Amino acid sequence: MMKELIPLSARFTEALRGAADLHARQVRKGTKIPYIAHLLGVASIALHHGADEDEAIAALLHDTIEDAPRELGANWVQNWLRFRFGERVLEIVEGCTDADVSSKPSWRRRKESYIAGLPKEPSSVLLVSASDKLHNASAVLSDYREIGNRVWARFDKEAGKDGTIGYYRGLVTAYQRTSKHPRLIRELDAVVAQIEVEAGHLGVWPLPR
């Protein structure tokens, strides 16, 4: 059931400005697309699936802890999120962050830990997280159609084609187990399935060791 419409306030506008400032010098991997395009896409998907204002703000800011300029530091970003937007927005953003940026483990360990933790996350985190993954997976599919297997070089060397597709399949399975946001998860599942078909590779998670 869709939530009652809540008009977006000046807080959302402030979050949009903050996202634009914090990610101003960043582009999407392997492209010249400004990173803000991804953040707007995630917020749009979340709103389409019933996000309230806190969830929409968290969608805009979901990458700030991991990807804000290093000179600011994760602690500064967390304090800024808490002071400007409140504890709930901070908690959603933290729930969407897949690693402690002060001691970032390997790609495999980060992704295994993230997927394992999803069933314990509240509905708001799952909404923003799945919106992020749907936007990312849709970009992977679009880019694969344009440049073929070269797209996998944009990802962590430890991931490659097998790891990337396997990770998305593992995400879908984890989201499905929560029984939250079923329409959103069906959309993600459909995109991941299409990647598997077109790339000729069924995703397997966890990855073989």
Label each residue range with its predicted role.
Residues M1-R209:
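Active-site helical microenvironments for divalent-metal-assisted chemistry
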